[in-house]
């Protein structure tokens, strides 16, 4: 605490023994020990009060941030949020209504469809709205044509390979030569 070494402590003890005397030295040491104890207790009490005040300040800050989060999330309950979203979307379209042509739809569906689905430029056929690439058009044309089997493919039989009359010895020579 005071950074006193052993040599300094011996010097202080010798000076105290000479100045105070051997009779009164034990009483003085007892009194110095009591003062040191009181000083330590006061320091510990001060440190405890300081730590307690810091904990209270931290707890108050945590409580404040918790209250802010709770206030921010109070209106966002999961059911409340989903209800607001579904109410804003309205009723989903029925599958039967989607399959019907536009002329057979009820007037309410037509107004909703015209507001959401129809482009501003007028009515465009779905096929004309999306241009097809050459490969898509070719694939559709080929898929719609029936397959025709021509006579040249009906009777086609594989021709046998021409037979060679080489001996195995000649085949080995040819293989080595190449």
Swiss-Prot record:
Give the Pfam families listed for this entry: TatA_B_E (PF02416)
Q: Where is the composition biased (Polar residues)?
A: 77-86
Where is composition skewed (Low complexity) in this entry? 155-165
Compositionally biased residues, Basic and acidic residues = 93-102, 166-178
- Identify the GO cellular component terms for this protein: TAT protein transport complex
- Which Gene3D superfamilies does the record associate with it? 1.20.5.3310
According to its UniProt entry, the protein's GO biological process terms are: protein transport by the Tat complex
Keyword Transmembrane on entry: yes
Q: According to Swiss-Prot or TrEMBL, what is its membrane topology?
A: Single-pass membrane protein
Report the main location listed first in the record. Answer: membrane
Q: Name one GO molecular function term.
A: protein transmembrane transporter activity
Chain residue ranges for the region called Disordered: 77-178
User: Where are the membrane-spanning stretches?
Assistant: 1-21
What family is this? Belongs to the TatB family.
The free-text function statement in the UniProt record for this protein reads: Part of the twin-arginine translocation (Tat) system that transports large folded proteins containing a characteristic twin-arginine motif in their signal peptide across membranes. Together with TatC, TatB is part of a receptor directly interacting with Tat signal peptides. TatB may form an oligomeric binding site that transiently accommodates folded Tat precursor proteins before their translocation.
Q: Which HAMAP family match?
A: TatB
Self-association and partners: The Tat system comprises two distinct complexes: a TatABC complex, containing multiple copies of TatA, TatB and TatC subunits, and a separate TatA complex, containing only TatA subunits. Substrates initially bind to the TatABC complex, which probably triggers association of the separate TatA complex to form the active translocon.
**Name of the featured protein:** Sec-independent protein translocase protein TatB
User: What organism is listed for this UniProt entry?
Assistant: Nitrobacter hamburgensis (strain DSM 10229 / NCIMB 13809 / X14)
């Amino acid at each position: 605490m005071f950074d006193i070494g052993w040599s300094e402590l011996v010097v202080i003890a010798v000076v105290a023994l000479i100045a105070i005397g051997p009779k009164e030295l034990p009483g003085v040491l007892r009194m110095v020990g009591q003062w040191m104890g009181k000083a330590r207790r006061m320091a510990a009490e001060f440190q405890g009060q300081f730590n307690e005040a810091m904990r209270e300040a931290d707890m108050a800050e945590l409580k404040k941030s918790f209250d802010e989060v709770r206030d921010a999330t109070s209106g966002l309950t999961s059911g409340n949020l989903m209800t607001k979203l579904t109410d804003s979307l309205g009723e989903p379209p029925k599958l039967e209504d989607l399959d019907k042509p536009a002329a057979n739809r009820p007037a309410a569906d037509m107004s909703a469809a015209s507001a959401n689905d129809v482009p501003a430029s007028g009515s465009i056929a779905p096929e004309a709205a999306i241009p097809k690439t050459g490969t898509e058009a070719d694939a559709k044309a080929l898929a719609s044509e029936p397959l025709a089997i021509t006579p040249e493919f009906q009777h086609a039989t594989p021709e046998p390979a021409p037979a060679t009359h080489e001996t195995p010895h000649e085949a080995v020579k040819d293989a080595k030569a190449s």
